[in-house]
Regions:
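Single, function-defining residue in the core of a domain
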Residues: 1-225
Length: 225
């Protein structure tokens, strides 16, 4: 049932106000540990500290977590990861490189997965029929990751809605998931998809907690400090 049991890490985030182009430039030049996204790596470390050592732990993240340093630090903390990819990463293939998209195009579907997709504005509720592909890949560290591992061996699970499942005027559902878990068969791939879908429940839990539990969003402060 994937029922949430509690919080292993929780923090209130006060985002610094930075205007326009300065925000983009500043974010690009900051060391990873000074970036806002580093909070996800801290969450992994805090979770490891409060969960029994004999329990296998997995951080599930959305596209915001598609950061090489995050994947590296999560593994070092003793956690696995499952994240939705946002970058068309270059992957090592023999003595050359190919993009993740190029590799997936060559891969034939290895099975199908169906689930009920709830409706929302601009999208009808339906049973989505997804084609499933999976494969091991090797991603290399960006130049900004000085001092870390040169490469990471991970698995990619790709799910894309079949054309005959998509209503007219709507885009197909498509996820590219990267994980440190071994994925060598359809059962393992579907397990990763199920874990990723748990994000919907987790996000709803946080939304209710913020709005109905702690009413954080109703608090108006003169100063964020």
């Amino acid at each position: 049932s994937y029922l949430p049991l509690g919080f292993s890490s929780l923090r209130i985030w006060n985002r610094e106000r930075v205007e326009g182009r300065k925000k983009t430039n500043r974010r690009a030049t900051l060391p990873y540990k000074d970036k806002e996204s580093y909070r996800w790596a801290l969450a992994a470390k805090e979770s490891v500290a409060c969960i029994p050592s004999d329990v296998r732990k997995t951080i599930v993240g959305d596209r915001e977590n598609d950061i090489y340093a995050f994947m590296e630090e999560t593994l070092e903390a003793g956690c696995d990861f499952l994240i939705r990819s946002s970058h068309n990463r270059k992957c090592a293939v023999d003595d050359d490189f190919e993009t993740l998209t190029e590799l997936l195009i060559k891969r034939k579907p290895m099975g199908e997965y169906r689930f009920s997709l709830p409706g929302r504005k601009g999208r009808k509720n339906r049973t989505a029929i997804m084609e499933v592909r999976f494969m091991p890949i090797t991603i290399h560290a960006p130049h900004s990751n000085a001092g870390g591992k040169e490469k990471l061996d991970v698995y990619c699970v790709h799910v894309k809605e079949r054309a005959d499942s998509v209503p007219a005027s709507e885009e197909p559902i498509e996820w590219r998931l990267l994980t440190s878990h071994e994925v060598t068969n359809l059962t393992q791939a579907v397990q990763c998809i199920e874990w990723y879908k748990c994000r919907w429940l987790i996000e709803e839990l946080f939304r209710v907690t913020k709005s109905k539990g702690f009413t954080i969003e109703n608090v108006q402060l003169e100063d964020g400090e």
